């Protein structure tokens, strides 16, 4: 990974095996240590106009506070002594709200030496102070430049980008060129994801390929969920 200029890992979307943190400590890979939280479907439904904001989870609901604090505390206590961890992430794609703000404040009480990351406030900007980093997903380079032009002094990252199917990664170099610009504010991003979700399988002609959704006769399936399928 380091030989290919990869210098950071986001443990999306939950704690990873202990050995990964040890390896990052040893080899000098930065880490965003992410808490186990995702409620993607609830705010998708809200943004589609099917349900009001009251249906989004965890949002401002006090009944979620105890379990989310417990999860975040477990993440912190397990991984706090790993020097590779530079940033704590509250979770993935769970909208915003007061409960997440309170989680961020808890982490800052525990540890004022690391940054707090949370992307979901992009979709619910009521509590922008939840995150120390401006974090987006799948923005175009044009979108990133337009945001940076607004003058936000916080560091900007793409916590997910380049989830590309087939041969559709042609503009990836533009993100790298932007990150290489001095003092532009864009810190880089985390490619989703490092390893394709595929399994080697022979086709009907005996040729090996990387099989994925639908290639085993299963339905329903996510279908196109991998990159290149032939060596």
Functional labels for PLM-detected ranges:
Residues 1-228:
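Extended substrate-binding grooves/exosites of carbohydrate-active enzymes
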């Amino acid at each position: 990974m380091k030989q290919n200029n990869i210098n950071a890992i986001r443990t999306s979307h939950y704690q990873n095996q202990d050995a990964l943190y040890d390896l990052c400590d040893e080899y000098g890979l930065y880490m965003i240590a992410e808490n186990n939280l995702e409620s993607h479907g609830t705010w998708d439904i809200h943004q589609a106009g099917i349900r009001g904001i009251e249906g989004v989870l965890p949002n401002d609901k006090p009944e979620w506070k105890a379990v989310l604090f417990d999860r975040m505390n477990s993440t912190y206590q397990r991984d706090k002594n790993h020097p590779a961890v530079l940033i704590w992430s509250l979770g993935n794609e769970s909208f915003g709200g007061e409960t997440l703000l309170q989680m961020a404040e808890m982490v800052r009480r525990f540890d004022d030496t690391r940054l707090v990351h949370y992307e979901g406030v992009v979709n619910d900007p009521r509590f922008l102070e939840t995150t120390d980093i401006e974090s987006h997903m799948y923005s175009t380079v044009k979108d990133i430049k337009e945001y940076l032009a607004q003058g936000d002094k916080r560091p900007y990252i793409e916590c997910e980008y380049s989830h590309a199917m087939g041969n559709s990664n042609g503009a990836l170099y533009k993100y790298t060129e932007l990150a290489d610009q001095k003092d532009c504010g864009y810190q880089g991003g985390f490619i989703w994801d490092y390893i394709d979700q595929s399994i080697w399988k022979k086709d009907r002609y005996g040729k090996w390929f990387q099989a994925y959704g639908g290639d085993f006769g299963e339905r329903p399936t996510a279908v196109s969920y991998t990159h290149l399928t032939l060596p």
